[in-house]
Amino acid sequence: MRPSGRTPEQLRPITITRQYTCHAEGSVLVEFGRTKVLCTATVTEGVPRFLKGKGQGWVTAEYGMLPRSTHSRMHREAASGKQGGRTLEIQRLIARSLRAAVDLTKLGENTITVDCDVLQADGGTRTASITGACVALADALNWMLAKGSLKTNPLNFMVAAVSVGIYEGAPVCDLDYDEDSSAETDMNLVMTETGKMIEIQGTAEGEPFSQEELMQLLELGKQGIQQIIQHQRQALA
C-alpha cells in the first residue's frame, strides 16, 4: 500500500494554472499534489555567442528551490554565489527536454529562458518543472506569434515527465517524498506526446532491478505521461 493510498498507476492531483504572473511572456504554476513549481518563460532578442550568425534560436532553463520549500530551511544558493551539482543537473535536463520539442531554426535569433522555481517540494520537482515549463514555453511562443516575431510555431509537440519507481517491491508512478525517500528503484522519464523517449534516468537505490521490472516501469511511466499531456492540452485549450 502506498502511503497516500493511491493505486500503483495513480498520479497525484495535477493543476496547471497559466498566466500566473503578469510580466513574463509565459508563466505557469504547476502542482503535482503538494509539489508546486512556478515556471516563467522569458523571450529575449539574440542568441549565445556560439550560435551567432547561424540563423537559429536557443531555449535554456534555470532551476532553483526556495529555502523553505522543504521540511527544513535550505541554504540559499545565491548567498554562496555557487549553484550545486544537483541544481545544474536538473536545469540542464529541463533545457534538453524543451529543446527536443522545438525546431530552433524556426525561432529566429531569439532566446527563451525558462525559470523553474520550486515553491513547495514533495517529490518529483524536476518532472513537475519539465511539465510546467513546456506549457510556459508554449505560451511564450504564442506571444511571439501574436506579436509577429515568428511566422510559424516552432513547437513540434508537447513534452512532459514523471517519476516511476519500485516501492516496497511494487512498481509505482509519480512518487511523492515519502515514497521517493525509501524507494528501492527511482527513475525519471521524459517523453513526447507522440510517445517517444527524450530521457531516462534510473538508479537502483537498494535492490538491483530486472529487465522485466524496467519494462514495467517504462510502460507505467508512458501511461502516466499520456495523462499529464492531457492536462497540458486542457490547460492550453
From Swiss-Prot:
Keywords in alphabetical order: Nucleotidyltransferase, RNA-binding, rRNA processing, Transferase, tRNA processing, tRNA-binding
EC number(s) given by UniProt: 2.7.7.56
Gene3D superfamilies according to UniProt: GHMP Kinase, N-terminal domain (3.30.230.70)
One Gene Ontology MF term: tRNA nucleotidyltransferase activity
InterPro entries the UniProt entry points to: ExoRNase_PH_dom1, ExoRNase_PH_dom2, ExoRNase_PH_dom2_sf, PNPase/RNase_PH_dom_sf, Ribosomal_Su5_D2-typ_SF, RNase_PH, RNase_PH_bac-type, RNase_PH_CS
Keyword RNA-binding: yes
First-tier enzyme category under EC: transferase
Lineage: superkingdom: Bacteria
CDD domains in UniProt: RNase_PH_bact
Residues noted as binding phosphate in the record, renumbered to the chain: 86, 124-126
Reactions mediated catalytically: tRNA(n+1) + phosphate = tRNA(n) + a ribonucleoside 5'-diphosphate
Record GO biological process: rRNA catabolic process; rRNA processing; tRNA processing
HAMAP family, alphabetized: RNase_PH (MF_00564)
Task of the protein: Phosphorolytic 3'-5' exoribonuclease that plays an important role in tRNA 3'-end maturation. Removes nucleotide residues following the 3'-CCA terminus of tRNAs; can also add nucleotides to the ends of RNA molecules by using nucleoside diphosphates as substrates, but this may not be physiologically important. Probably plays a role in initiation of 16S rRNA degradation (leading to ribosome degradation) during starvation.
Family statement: Belongs to the RNase PH family.
Assembly behavior: Homohexameric ring arranged as a trimer of dimers.
Name of the protein in question: Ribonuclease PH
Designated gene of the protein: rph
